Amino acid sequence: MNRIKKGDTVVVISGKNKNKSGVVIQVNPKEQTALVEGVNKIKRHQKKDQTHEQSGIIEKEAPIRLCKLALVDPKGKDKGKATKVKYLLKDNKKVRVARKSGSELDVNKK
């Protein structure tokens, strides 16, 4: 079960990008990877053609494994730090909750 979703703010907990944070752009549950804005940047040499308007060296985000990411706690004394996620039933719906502060994670998302 994926605990990280598109639009979440996450922090990298291991690897060369440790302690960098960003917003999740895309999640691929089958491959257990995610694209995070501003994290794990790579450079690609790209030729101009019909599909690519820009040519030269392009810097873009590469996928990063979900096991290296942790959600950022939105509220409480641990605001901005990594937290685990638990699920609670609220009005017969599953709600994601930060373990450290107990605050809901899906409040303003659609």
UniProtKB/Swiss-Prot annotation:
Q: What molecular function terms (GO) are annotated for this protein?
A: rRNA binding; structural constituent of ribosome
Q: Which GO terms describe its cellular component?
A: ribonucleoprotein complex; ribosome
Q: Does the keyword Transmembrane apply?
A: no
Short name of one Pfam family: ribosomal_L24
Q: Name one GO biological process term.
A: translation
Q: Which domain of life is it from?
A: Bacteria
**Keyword line:** Ribonucleoprotein, Ribosomal protein, RNA-binding, rRNA-binding
Residues of the signal peptide:
none
Say if the entry is tagged with keyword Cytoplasm. no
Q: Which PROSITE patterns match?
A: RIBOSOMAL_L24
| Database matches in InterPro entries | KOW (IPR005824), Rib_uL2_dom2 (IPR014722), Ribosomal_uL24 (IPR003256), Ribosomal_uL24_CS (IPR005825), Ribosomal_uL24_KOW (IPR041988), Translation_prot_SH3-like_sf (IPR008991)
Q: How does it assemble?
A: Part of the 50S ribosomal subunit.
What does it do?
One of two assembly initiator proteins, it binds directly to the 5'-end of the 23S rRNA, where it nucleates assembly of the 50S subunit. One of the proteins that surrounds the polypeptide exit tunnel on the outside of the subunit.
The similarity annotation says: Belongs to the universal ribosomal protein uL24 family.
Entry-linked PANTHER family? MITOCHONDRIAL RIBOSOMAL PROTEIN L24
Full protein name: Large ribosomal subunit protein uL24
Q: Which organism is it from?
A: Ureaplasma parvum serovar 3 (strain ATCC 700970)
Q: What is the lineage of its organism?
A: Bacteria, Bacillati, Mycoplasmatota, Mycoplasmoidales, Mycoplasmoidaceae
- Gene behind this chain? rplX
